[in-house]
Amino acid sequence: MAGTGLFAEILDGEVYKYYADGEWKTSSSGKSVAIMNPATRKTQYKVQACTQEEVNAVMELAKSAQKSWAKTPLWKRAELLHKAAAILKDNKAPMAESLVKEIAKPAKDSVTEVVRSGDLISYCAEEGVRILGEGKFLLSDSFPGNDRTKYCLTSKIPLGVVLAIPPFNYPVNLAVSKIAPALIAGNSLVLKPPTQGAVSCLHMVHCFHLAGFPKGLISCITGKGSEIGDFLTMHPAVNCISFTGGDTGISISKKAGMIPLQMELGGKDACIVLDDADLDLVASNIIKGGFSYSGQRCTAVKVVLVMESVADELVEKVKAKVAKLTVGPPEENSDITAVVSESSANFIEGLVMDAKEKGATFCQEYKREGNLIWPLLLDNVRPDMRIAWEEPFGPVVPVLRINSVEEGINHCNASNFGLQGCVFTKDINKAILISDAMETGTVQINSAPARGPDHFPFQGLKDSGIGSQGVTNSINLMTKVKTTVINLPTPSYSMG
Ligand SMILES: NC(=O)C1=CN([C@@H]2O[C@H](COP(=O)(O)OP(=O)(O)OC[C@H]3O[C@@H](n4cnc5c(N)ncnc54)[C@H](OP(=O)(O)O)[C@@H]3O)[C@@H](O)[C@H]2O)C=CC1
Ligand SMILES: O=C(O)[C@H](O)COP(=O)(O)O
């Protein structure tokens, strides 16, 4: 059970502690932040509301711990990461349990998230020892006007303190996707978990604690982003911010100083369906892509752009599959569970009502109880409806009928977002041309958008982000290139 056994020390009465200087602590604020269970809409957990002084203390510790961590051999950093991964996987139950309770993720998917996170940490350790163990050697005489008098050696050095801010929907996985690359690269790490998802993150951090990382190297500050977010992101000790979430990321980017930013933000992933597509395959992918975790994925299918000639048939197939989705508690592995908050449910409802007023075809009756919204397919959506452009982050999928492929591409490219997209056709040549024309970070051919596997590059164009994720890209982003040039008194060439 969460907060018991191996994890008992992370709890103080009914409030979870924060983590600093290698210890679990109670905030001097005397205040806590409530975490609501999205399904019951009752307070499930409480976490510390950390103060600015506590943030300052953590940053000082992170700065000094990083100096000695950077001198720790790569293989030792990797060894500790492997240890943390093993502890995490061995103790998946309390983390999965808290994911169910604080973000209403179905029980099976919650376990998958923790296991995937352990695998990500291990992969990162292995990738890190390889790519950070290599550098470059350049010779001066390849540039015009130079003899071979200079040997240039390059290597990758850490940035310093990395601030990691993940979102609610994959709190554990999107936290470790920032923590593991930061640590293997020799950085220290300050984590600000999402409020919904904080308890799962605190358990995950305890796994790193149990693995024996040096004191101060990893910290976890809890509190509402709206209250301590600016103080954290504008803190002078921070040398890199890795953020995943919504528009907040855009304002952080504007306020952050001259530091590397990794921003994975919202998306309006389009699914373009050509008239030669395998419609059974498309229908299954719309269900998986649009309704998994009740549509609360940045990579969810958020608009279907289907050729008019096959639209009726596709809509019928999707409708039949929607009817089979189960709706209910996450504990019972229901396909559709309560969305994360009442404000989120209200926002989704706003999009649905706007589509209703403007004449969209409802393939199912709209139904909502508390934060639980029944899966809904909206046909005949038009560009004047909000749902054609905004991301619901809920179990609602709009279908726009198109008369040409160009119309589909234009709709996709007119979005402010550019995260992922997908195209369904049996003609691979057409698929490649469409993929090249879509202004998104990734295009999936004949499958729904997805971030995983976690070592693939993952990035958004336009308002969907800055930089690229994926294990290798994250390690690279969290390092800087350092060069040393050896100057010879006379040119030297190897002979023979
Ligand atoms: N591209 C991608 O990889 C992904 C994108 N997303 C996007 O994220 C959104 C949903 O996630 P959600 O968690 O609601 O996103 P938010 O942007 O609301 O929150 C993300 C994180 O930022 C924190 N935060 C809030 N305000 C501030 C602030 N002023 N300064 C610093 N941090 C702050 C939050 O903390 P707190 O919870 O305490 O408010 C949370 O940890 C969707 O738009 C979705 O598309 C989601 C997942 C992946
Ligand atoms: O937050 C998200 O939506 C995730 O980054 C998506 O991950 P997935 O595509 O692997 O589910």
From Swiss-Prot:
<dbReference type="InterPro" id="IPR051020">
    <property type="entry name" value="ALDH-related_metabolic_enz"/>
</dbReference>
<keyword id="KW-0597">Phosphoprotein</keyword>
<feature type="binding site">
    <location>
        <position position="391"/>
    </location>
    <ligand>
        <name>NADP(+)</name>
    </ligand>
</feature>
<dbReference type="Pfam" id="PF00171">
    <property type="entry name" value="Aldedh"/>
</dbReference>
<dbReference type="InterPro" id="IPR016161">
    <property type="entry name" value="Ald_DH/histidinol_DH"/>
</dbReference>
<comment type="function">
    <text>Important as a means of generating NADPH for biosynthetic reactions.</text>
</comment>
<dbReference type="InterPro" id="IPR015590">
    <property type="entry name" value="Aldehyde_DH_dom"/>
</dbReference>
<feature type="binding site">
    <location>
        <begin position="245"/>
        <end position="249"/>
    </location>
    <ligand>
        <name>NAD(+)</name>
    </ligand>
</feature>
<feature type="modified residue" description="N-acetylalanine">
    <location>
        <position position="2"/>
    </location>
</feature>
<feature type="binding site">
    <location>
        <position position="230"/>
    </location>
    <ligand>
        <name>NADP(+)</name>
    </ligand>
</feature>
<dbReference type="InterPro" id="IPR016162">
    <property type="entry name" value="Ald_DH_N"/>
</dbReference>
<dbReference type="InterPro" id="IPR016160">
    <property type="entry name" value="Ald_DH_CS_CYS"/>
</dbReference>
<keyword id="KW-0963">Cytoplasm</keyword>
<dbReference type="InterPro" id="IPR029510">
    <property type="entry name" value="Ald_DH_CS_GLU"/>
</dbReference>
<feature type="binding site">
    <location>
        <position position="116"/>
    </location>
    <ligand>
        <name>substrate</name>
    </ligand>
</feature>
<feature type="active site" description="Proton acceptor">
    <location>
        <position position="264"/>
    </location>
</feature>
<dbReference type="GO" id="GO:0005737">
    <property type="term" value="C:cytoplasm"/>
</dbReference>
<keyword id="KW-0007">Acetylation</keyword>
<feature type="binding site">
    <location>
        <begin position="297"/>
        <end position="299"/>
    </location>
    <ligand>
        <name>substrate</name>
    </ligand>
</feature>
<keyword id="KW-0521">NADP</keyword>
<dbReference type="GO" id="GO:0008886">
    <property type="term" value="F:glyceraldehyde-3-phosphate dehydrogenase (NADP+) (non-phosphorylating) activity"/>
</dbReference>
<feature type="binding site">
    <location>
        <begin position="169"/>
        <end position="170"/>
    </location>
    <ligand>
        <name>substrate</name>
    </ligand>
</feature>
<feature type="active site" description="Nucleophile">
    <location>
        <position position="298"/>
    </location>
</feature>
<protein>
    <recommendedName>
        <fullName>NADP-dependent glyceraldehyde-3-phosphate dehydrogenase</fullName>
        <ecNumber>1.2.1.9</ecNumber>
    </recommendedName>
</protein>
<feature type="binding site">
    <location>
        <position position="192"/>
    </location>
    <ligand>
        <name>NADP(+)</name>
    </ligand>
</feature>
<comment type="similarity">
    <text>Belongs to the aldehyde dehydrogenase family.</text>
</comment>
<feature type="binding site">
    <location>
        <position position="451"/>
    </location>
    <ligand>
        <name>substrate</name>
    </ligand>
</feature>
<feature type="site" description="Transition state stabilizer">
    <location>
        <position position="169"/>
    </location>
</feature>
<keyword id="KW-0560">Oxidoreductase</keyword>
<feature type="binding site">
    <location>
        <position position="195"/>
    </location>
    <ligand>
        <name>NADP(+)</name>
    </ligand>
</feature>
<feature type="modified residue" description="Phosphothreonine">
    <location>
        <position position="4"/>
    </location>
</feature>
<dbReference type="InterPro" id="IPR016163">
    <property type="entry name" value="Ald_DH_C"/>
</dbReference>
